[in-house]
A protein has these predicted regions:
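Short, small-residue-biased leader/transition segments that mark boundaries at the very start
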Residues: 3-8
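Metallocofactor- and cofactor-centric catalytic cores in central/energy metabolism, strongly enriched
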Residues: 28-43, 57-60, 64-65, 290-293, ...
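Internal maturation/activation junctions in enzymes
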Residues: 50-53, 78-82, 115-211
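Catalytic alpha/beta core of large soluble enzyme barrels
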Residues: 55, 59-63, 70, 164-318
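Conserved phosphate/anionic-ligand binding catalytic regions in large, soluble enzymes, centered on
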Residues: 81-108, 316-319, 323-324
């Protein structure tokens, strides 16, 4: 039996920044301490919810059909979510890894090391949603972000992943001693999650989408580190939670890339390399950029276009504008 719930790393960062803003002495170590404090509170809250789930699901939503397909519920006379089976797959999905990792890296570089911004100025920028401060916003955004090999943001992503996994796996739920499986999966709701989130230190405006699952943000690698699907695949493989609960890789490839000689072989090699590096799930679309943009502008003109969203497929025309936009945003044409 399985169930899943999300832990919002972006909210832990938000509350951590608010805590730090109220302090007279501010440093990166204190921000990390406050971030981990709130992240732990969120994980414990989800665990408590699973204890409650274990007690009430058999009364409110028994698995009448699925119970018949498992060994245990009939023999024990118990619903699968209440002791009827030996294995309960209770998941916690972390989200916005890149949003948080890039934010920590931007603070470390621009505030702590280079001192191009003070802590007070950083908080002012966040509180005013970067109003009239585009230069400073871009300065925070244009660091070597998560996904760039050897970047400080990548180091932060691994550190955050490790702490989050330890919180999930370090102890079972308090009441019924249920084990939790950590993962990193935003289920496509990056706009919904970002809508109520204030500006973040990675240059993201208030209300903008957060990053997908454990993926780098679109456009993460520029200049020397030319953007490529390989860098994205490596970053996602590097930050897997490690217990089988997936952290998906979205690959949206222009058909022009695979129509050239060797293109298909290169794509097959990328898929195999990602899986061998520890990847757990690939959501892939191969469609021309021109067709995708036209379908986004006029979905009804392309009623038969099917796309992989995130963990499931759907007719592109059936998706909301926000869901279509995230597919366009992550589209890879380089």
């Amino acid at each position: 039996s399985s169930a899943a719930s999300d832990v919002y790393k972006r909210q832990a960062l938000h509350y951590g920044l608010k805590d730090l803003q109220a302090q007279e002495t501010r440093d990166l170590d204190l921000l990390w301490e406050r971030f981990t404090y709130h992240l732990q509170a969120m994980v414990e809250c989800v665990k408590a919810g699973y204890d409650k789930h274990y007690e009430v699901m058999q009364r409110n939503r028994p698995e009448i059909v699925l119970n018949l397909f498992m060994h245990g519920p009939i023999e024990r006379g118990l619903n699968c979510s209440n002791g009827g089976v030996d294995i309960l797959d209770l998941n916690i999905d972390g989200i916005a890894l890149a949003t948080v990792a890039d934010s920590f890296a931007a603070i470390e570089q621009r505030v702590v090391e280079e001192k191009k911004l003070t802590w007070d100025r950083l908080f002012e920028l966040l509180d005013t949603n970067y109003e009239g401060a585009e230069r400073e916003r871009l300065m925070l955004k244009n660091i070597r972000r998560f996904g760039s090999p050897g970047s400080r943001a990548q180091d932060w992503a691994v550190r955050i992943r490790d702490y989050y996994v330890a919180l999930c796996k370090g102890s079972p739920t308090r009441k019924h001693h249920l084990m939790i499986v950590p993962g990193l999966f935003s289920h496509g709701d990056v706009y919904a999650y970002g809508k109520t989130l204030e500006a973040t230190p990675n240059g993201r405006f208030a209300g903008d989408a957060i990053s997908h699952s454990s993926e780098p943000d679109p456009g993460f690698a520029r200049g020397v580190d030319t953007f490529s699907p390989v860098l994205k695949a490596n970053a996602v493989a590097l930050t897997q939670a490690g217990y089988g609960n997936s952290a998906p890789l979205h690959l949206d490839i222009d058909t022009g890339l695979i129509q050239h000689s060797g293109g298909v072989d290169a794509l097959v090699a990328l898929i195999h390399a990602h899986e061998q590096a520890g990847g757990t799930l690939i959501n892939m679309n191969c469609v021309s950029k021109e067709k995708l943009l036209k379908a986004h502008e006029d979905p009804k003109a392309y009623p038969d276009l099917v796309v992989r969203v995130t963990g499931y497929s759907a007719f592109f025309a059936s998706l909301s504008k926000e869901y279509r936009q995230q597919i366009v945003d992550r589209f890879l044409d380089e």
